[in-house]
């Protein structure tokens, strides 16, 4: 089927993925053509691509307020979260995990796997009616934890947009001697980080969430946190991630993050204005509509989750929007094949 031109469609699913910025494509193009060397090679082709990767790492670290040695490139957010969670258990001695029931499947399915293998005990922190984490319950669970604990909580929820105060969570973890991993896939590129001042052991990012390429992400590992690789083989990524690097993806990730952070304040104000306008018009037009989460409070400006009154017409809502060239989703893109709601 021939796809429609993007100009003819309205795209409302940027939490799932974003179109590639032409300036990012321009930065990537030389590494798809003449600069094709294997970064592990010692001759000139390899040296120039190695330089590109290390320059990208330095740029990403600077933009996130981290050290270059703390940034590792991965295939995306899922691999990065898997690496952090598995390493917390296998290398850092965590025998207990606290998470929430509304995490991304990259987290939920990983911790459930570890529990199923008998490697950890698992608890879910209470979620308040507005979608926020119950911080008092988290503190109580940390105090009562039966062993060294990993807390894994996302920074911004990919479906309702709620923001979790990762500084507050990190302080609770520090007091309890716990490891803290935060899935920050929705906020890297959309939020100003200073990781040197953030009490977190691991965060994750994915380039395609901020107009970069798919198939490339990052794992931040705080200095002094000693872990082993999830993927074994060669010594790439300073022995932390085997396999020939996604050269053009890494270059694209760094360029996309540079562009995103350069226009962050302007973009955030503009997108928030659109979000609030959309909510206002939906309220005026559709009686009984509800907005899930803390949509107009501690919420990411890029996400709006609306619930429509159940009717025969609403059951066909997404289909009818699609045939009218409006693209939006009824839940996480990673769960779009499931036959149950979010």
Where do the protein language model's features map onto the residues?
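Pyridoxal 5′-phosphate
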Residues: 1-342
